[in-house]
């Protein structure tokens, strides 16, 4: 029985997925029962919901049903506390006190994090019961680095859970000594200076207050090789090194999330946390700024919010504080000409992904490709670039000084080499849900056609769709005058970007022109040498009015609305404004002035310009270990640096390695559970050091596979798992045969950038109509039967559209799995695909690196973009949003057959990024809550646009908006999600970011600054200075420091912190090599100084570079022995 609310069609879809999962599970289980694998069963438990995931990942046994009951009755957070209480009370088995407390904290944290992230497993090292100096007992939670994956709120709640467990166990509070209190302050400062910064920088007194009042000890294991110098060798602190996990829980958990903890404390009635109220009140403004980037703007005159008032927004500069070399700044914070804020959601945006016109993606020299990450000014910290061609495109000035609106990709490609300046970058389409998620005040909307149409509807005016989308210029003016409505957005220029005096200068110049009947244009005399004409021409450019420049004239084809906007009656050829000087003097600003002289209302085109810079480039590539290997079969140093087992066999080499093994009754050493030489069942023990019989295993594997000669097969040097149990060599040979690679857990993966999509056209995903019908896509969004490839269909929540290169790679993986079934397990081939398109309909797993739970998905097609398209719910099920992160896909049968927990590294974080449990059915209630804020409307109401002018909080208008949250627990939670803006093609635009195609750092930075030079909203000198200061200088200093502290290494793989006294490798006697080269130290030196000179950086920067140069020279250049050329003697 299906446990989620869904329509009959969706229920059938989920049943089909479950049936396919069961089929693959059964097949893989049969293969494992043959005894050739590490275990004789599939090692990935299936979970239908959060409760199953929690039990599967952290336990205890039989807890799932009770979690379901409690969550249903109480809600998630109260249920987590109650389940922790019941565990320590022994309701799920008898545990020792410390074991019970640890189990309680882990299980409660798993409930809070939906049983997806690895934090409950890896983020909590252990829980201990320790003693205060007065002899009383208290609880200590040992946090580890992976607690970061839980997020700040969950980190804080883990501490709250610990306090709740402590009370229920009758333990006393933690009573720290003064040295222990001060130790935290020292560690926080050291962490920020030597490791990385926190989101929130706490004051020393805040840390002291928190540590003295938190009832459990927040401690942890050492995470960084940096030691404290002051408060060392404390009896109850086991290490002198930084405890990174503990600091994260304290600073980014308890201190940063204080308001959220207080809400839970008040709601749950937990005592002992009142001290947080005082702490919160002292720093509430700081917390809100970091958490929500709220209140980052102000109005000059809040009592009058009409469109004629000046409007100022405070620029958010955080995103541009650090600029990486080779990654352009597209717009400085809130700079005129930047990305214009526009509200709405296209079918490929939302959930932190914003839409941009595909034309601008080409005009910035391909630095904005589909899937490229941008760091943005607002509403969130980052976004992902996707094309939406129904929003405003860029406005550019060409080399011949003409100004042109680039509204198609064809135009962008035609004129890209002729662009002198990008005057306006175009729109950035942001959905209401992203403002709601970030609790960012709703900023005034730009003047757009959807707002305009709402006004016409509200006044019951007649109009055609063609008029809304592309009105004739005369028709637009006539309609505005007759109906007394604002001028159509198409002909509303950026009057607010120039002053009222500038408008008057431009007006005087334009009125002096004449009408050219031959080409229906307004013609003006143009002379670049005339400063007055040049100034007026610049104002024409800045308002974004298209015009063509010839040798002696400027021709304006959109003359009709332009002239009428400036108070000139074109039809009567007369100026209709009286006393222009008086109006200029009596109006308060540009918008007031233009509305005074125009015969109709003119709205402000843009209120908000959003700044942005490039973050990470898009990614679509197979997952490889470093170096890439084909199998988890260790060969030590026998394969030399290239790690080729076939080369080791040819040269007769072997090596001693530590590995699980057993002596078989046949006399051979078996590394597997089934002896490959006699077929007997054995049980390897160990690990122990043995001389590996590489040659014997190699030829036996080839014999088993009936392969005469294999190509190059790359293997690992040694296992890092606890038992050091290995994978059969046959799998490595078959992977190499099919040109694929293995990951640490035995699976074969493909990584790609997460991008949302809720609707698609068959033509976009390269799948036939009949195949889509077979997969359950019978009707389009309008309810019409699916008949052609251009109809828009709603994506089912567990279907994914993979990159083309992923399909090619999975084609090879399917060949490997079929070979494995046929040649190794002696079973029928499963996939039997002859071309990549035949993989459509097969199941995969989607997984994020910081999690331990996978989600079942189904391939329904591929796109040319280097991104992984999936439903926002699907990404949210992996605890991800879509702001530029990347996750992995891998074939479900591959995971069932080849994954093993016993391959995972025996170190902290080793169980992250491994499918320890698999969710089969996606429940929207149990995914990352951020997606619940995504709006699901087909159009925004007029009230939204009007309210946006008031600068209200997003929650205040939630009642007039529709979000995913409103659909939960209803059949409509899976279907009928709307979008407001159409786009023709989801993978339109550059497919590869220029950053990935350029070679040297000099090439990258030159291209970066070339982009900055031609964008009006960017200051190239500032970009150059920021690149030097935030990237090059820290790298130069860091590499210089690393050189002086470096260790040495040997070609055999041995590493030494200091040079051995013998001067050679202690293992093999070979010459030792430096780990940091001279080239690594000075690689950015020349490019930094070249940039500083070329872009006239400040004297401070130039002098700092000179100091670094002298430091490098003092290290590498011998002052006493100076190399000279022979010609120097003849000077």
From Swiss-Prot:
The protein's Enzyme Commission number: 2.7.7.7, 3.1.11.1
Pfam family, one: PolC_DP2_N
InterPro entries: PolC_DP2, PolC_DP2_cat_dom, PolC_DP2_central_dom, PolC_DP2_N
Keyword Zinc-finger belongs to the record: no
Keywords (A to Z) from UniProt: DNA replication, DNA-binding, DNA-directed DNA polymerase, Exonuclease, Hydrolase, Multifunctional enzyme, Nuclease, Nucleotidyltransferase, Transferase
Stored HAMAP family: DNApol_II_L_arch (MF_00324)
Protein function: Possesses two activities: a DNA synthesis (polymerase) and an exonucleolytic activity that degrades single-stranded DNA in the 3'- to 5'-direction. Has a template-primer preference which is characteristic of a replicative DNA polymerase.
Self-association and partners: Heterodimer of a large subunit and a small subunit.
NCBIfam families: polC (TIGR00354), PRK04023.1 (NF003103)
Family statement: Belongs to the archaeal DNA polymerase II family.
Name this polypeptide is given: DNA polymerase II large subunit
Gene: polC
């Amino acid at each position: 029985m299906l446990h989620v609310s869904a329509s009959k069609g969706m229920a059938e879809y989920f049943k089909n997925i479950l049936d396919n999962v069961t089929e693959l599970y059964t097949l893989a289980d049969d293969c494992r029962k043959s005894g050739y694998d590490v275990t004789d069963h599939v090692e990935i438990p299936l979970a239908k919901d959060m409760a199953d995931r929690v039990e599967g990942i952290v336990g205890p046994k039989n807890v799932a049903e009770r979690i379901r009951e409690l969550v249903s009755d109480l809600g998630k957070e109260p249920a987590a506390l109650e389940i922790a209480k019941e565990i320590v009370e022994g309701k799920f088995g008898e545990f020792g006190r410390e074991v019970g407390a640890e189990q309680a904290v882990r299980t409660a944290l798993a409930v809070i994090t939906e049983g997806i992230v690895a934090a409950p497993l890896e983020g909590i090292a252990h829980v201990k019961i320790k003693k205060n100096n007065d002899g009383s007992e208290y609880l200590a939670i040992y946090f580890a680095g992976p607690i970061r994956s839980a997020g700040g709120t969950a980190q804080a709640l883990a501490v709250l859970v610990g306090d709740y467990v402590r009370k229920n166990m009758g333990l006393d509070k933690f009573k720290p000594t003064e040295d222990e209190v001060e130790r935290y302050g020292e560690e926080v400062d050291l962490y920020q200076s030597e490791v990385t910064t926190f989101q929130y920088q706490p004051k020393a007194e805040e840390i002291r207050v928190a540590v003295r009042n938190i009832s459990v000890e927040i401690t942890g294991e050492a995470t960084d090789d940096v030691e404290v110098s002051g408060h060392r060798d404390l009896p109850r602190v086991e290490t002198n090194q930084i405890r990174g996990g503990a600091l994260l829980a304290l600073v980014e958990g308890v201190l940063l999330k204080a308001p959220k903890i207080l809400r839970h404390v008040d709601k749950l009635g937990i005592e002992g946390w009142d001290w947080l109220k005082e702490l919160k009140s002292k720093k509430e403004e700081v917390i809100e700024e970091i958490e929500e980037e709220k209140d980052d703007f102000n109005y000059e005159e809040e009592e009058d919010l009409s469109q004629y008032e000046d409007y100022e927004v405070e620029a958010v500069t955080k995103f541009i504080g650090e600029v990486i070399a080779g990654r352009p700044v597209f717009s400085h914070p809130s700079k005129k000409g930047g990305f214009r804020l526009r509200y709405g959601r296209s079918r490929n945006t939302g959930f932190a992904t914003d839409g941009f016109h595909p034309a601008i993606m080409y005009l910035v020299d391909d630095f904005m490709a589909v899937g490229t990450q941008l760091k943005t000014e607002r509403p969130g910290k980052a976004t992902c670039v996707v094309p939406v061609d129904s929003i405003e495109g860029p406005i550019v000035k060409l080399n011949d000084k003409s100004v042109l609106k680039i509204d198609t990709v064809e135009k962008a490609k035609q004129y890209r080499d002729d662009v002198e300046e990008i005057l306006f970058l175009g729109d950035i389409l942001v959905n209401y849900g992203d403002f709601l998620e970030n609790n960012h005040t709703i900023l005034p909307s730009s003047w757009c056609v959807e707002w305009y149409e709402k006004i016409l509807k509200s006044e019951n005016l007649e109009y055609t769709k063609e008029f809304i989308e592309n009105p004739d210029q005369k028709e637009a003016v006539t309609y505005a005058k007759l109906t007394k409505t604002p001028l159509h957005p198409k002909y509303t220029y950026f009057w607010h970007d120039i002053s009222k005096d500038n408008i008057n200068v431009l007006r005087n110049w334009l009125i002096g022109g004449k009408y050219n009947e031959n080409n229906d244009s307004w013609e003006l005399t143009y002379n670049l040498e005339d400063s007055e004409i040049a100034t007026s021409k610049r104002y024409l450019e800045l308002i974004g009015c298209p015009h063509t420049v010839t040798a002696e004239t400027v021709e304006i084809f959109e003359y009709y609305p332009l002239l009428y906007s400036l108070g000139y009656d074109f039809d009567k050829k007369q100026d209709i404004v009286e006393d222009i000087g008086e109006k200029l003097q009596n109006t308060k600003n540009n918008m007031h002035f233009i509305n005074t002289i125009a015969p109709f209302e003119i709205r402000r085109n843009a209120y908000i310009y959003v700044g942005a810079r490039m973050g990470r480039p898009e990614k679509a590539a197979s997952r490889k270990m470093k170096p890439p290997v084909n199998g988890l079969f260790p060969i030590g140093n026998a394969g030399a640096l290239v790690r080729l087992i076939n080369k080791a066999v040819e040269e007769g080499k072997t090596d001693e390695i530590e590995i699980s093994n057993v002596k078989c009754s046949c006399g051979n050493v078996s590394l597997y559970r089934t002896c490959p030489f006699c077929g007997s069942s054995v049980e390897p023990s160990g690990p122990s050091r043995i001389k590996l019989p590489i040659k014997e295993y190699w030829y036996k594997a080839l014999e088993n596979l009936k392969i005469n000669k294999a190509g190059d097969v790359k293997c690992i040097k040694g296992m890092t798992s606890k038992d050091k149990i290995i994978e059969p060599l046959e799998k490595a040979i078959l992977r190499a045969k099919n040109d694929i690679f293995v990951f640490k857990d035995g699976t074969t993966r493909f990584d790609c950038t997460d991008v949302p999509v809720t609707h698609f056209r068959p033509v976009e995903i390269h799948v036939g109509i009949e195949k889509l019908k077979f997969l359950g896509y019978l009707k389009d969004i309008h309810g019409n039967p699916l008949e052609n490839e251009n109809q828009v269909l709603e994506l089912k929540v567990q279907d994914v559209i993979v990159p083309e290169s992923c399909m090619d790679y999975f084609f090879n993986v399917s060949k490997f799995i079929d070979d494995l079934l046929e040649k190794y397990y002696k079973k029928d081939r499963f996939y039997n695909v002859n071309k990549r398109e035949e993989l459509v309909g097969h199941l995969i797993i989607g997984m994020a690196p910081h999690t331990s739970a996978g989600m079942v998905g189904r391939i329904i097609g591929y796109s040319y973009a280097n991104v992984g398209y999936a439903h926002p719910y699907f990404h949210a099920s992996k605890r991800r949003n879509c702001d530029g992160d990347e996750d992995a896909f891998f074939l479900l049968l591959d995971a069932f057959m080849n994954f093993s927990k016993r391959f995972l590294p025996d170190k902290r974080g080793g169980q992250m990024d491994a499918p320890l449990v698999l969710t089969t059915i996606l429940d929207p209630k149990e995914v990352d809550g951020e997606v619940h804020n995504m709006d699901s409307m087909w159009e925004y109401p007029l009230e939204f646009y009007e309210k946006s002018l008031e600068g209200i909080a997003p929650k205040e208008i939630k009642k007039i908006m529709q979000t995913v949250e409103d659909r939960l627990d209803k059949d409509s939670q899976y279907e009928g999600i709307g979008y407001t803006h159409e786009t023709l093609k989801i993978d339109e635009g550059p497919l590869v970011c220029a950053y990935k195609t350029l070679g040297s750092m000099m090439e990258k930075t030159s291209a970066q600054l070339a982009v900055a030079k031609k964008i009006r909203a960017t200051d190239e000198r500032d970009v150059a200075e920021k690149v030097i200061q935030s990237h090059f200088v820290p790298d130069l200093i860091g590499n210089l420091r690393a050189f002086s502290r470096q260790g040495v290494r040997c070609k055999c793989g041995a590493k030494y912190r200091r040079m051995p006294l013998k001067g050679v490798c202690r293992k093999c006697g070979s010459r030792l090599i430096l780990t940091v080269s001279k080239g690594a130290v000075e690689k950015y030196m020349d490019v930094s100084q070249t940039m500083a000179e070329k872009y006239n950086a400040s004297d401070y920067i130039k002098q700092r570079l000179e100091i670094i140069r002298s430091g490098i020279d003092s290290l590498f250049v011998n002052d006493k022995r100076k190399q000279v050329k022979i010609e120097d003697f003849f000077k």
